[in-house]
């Protein structure tokens, strides 16, 4: 939803993980960079594993996450049925469970025999220790109630909407393709919608769209229909959170956001990719249950976990993420560098910034 990469500078090289026959599947992509220090390049991922991984054991789920030490952040993740520790973004070390909260490093690592002990407070994991080193758990997910960006609008949103509807998008010159926005559900009713900006479940906790509908430029919409049909063979469909976004909504986002958080929203003076009708935010849903699958991060999350190549989480979460990305890229979409859920269709720059409201499309 937000162009945070465009406001920052790429620093350093992309770290890549060393592989382990025990811990890493041959087809997983793990290159990434920490959000606070450097930003990752969205390289083409290796194909998702043909065999769907099993869910991680429930007893490990509370342990998975990031832990901050004096000089590094340690990631505890599950891969191929093993719990592992990732050091310095390069060294992946498998763990062997001894008790509920005590592990030791596997014999395949240079840390063989060292103990890893997790500590809890009222049932919640708060830290881990390795010898004399202590790593404090870093709150990441919404289940921990931290680091989920929420923006308190500077002014009442209804007033901002009224003002934005009276404003004009930036004037653009050049040759553009004709706008041909089509409604996704009219092309394929099996595409599910959960339009967050038609609800209060979003960054601003405010409703922006008067209708829960999703539109894309026709070539992008038809490509997404092909993605949805191909995914059915694997037992999945696409669930769309956002598509075409009228320019006036982008202006409201900007006007509602404090200066120190404006890097998370698009500048209306330039417009956003969503304004051009070729950007889509989406995830997968399970055809059997009808429910959205679990990914490494939540939608619109602003932590490192949102990166398309973030190595943490579980094998199944990463497999879902890579399955979506592979399917989208096969039909001409490109993933956004900092958000696994945001994809841009090829030639998106060739469309004008749009400002037509949902109610007026197709009239």
Enumerate the predicted regions with their spans.
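Bacterial N-terminal signal peptides
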Residues: 9-21
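Beta-rich nucleic-acid/ligand-interaction surfaces
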Residues: 247-253, 343-350
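A mature extracytoplasmic/lumenal domain signature
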Residues: 80, 89, 99, 109, ...
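K/E-rich alpha-helical interaction surfaces of small helical-bundle regulatory domains
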Residues: 61-73, 328-332, 339, 344
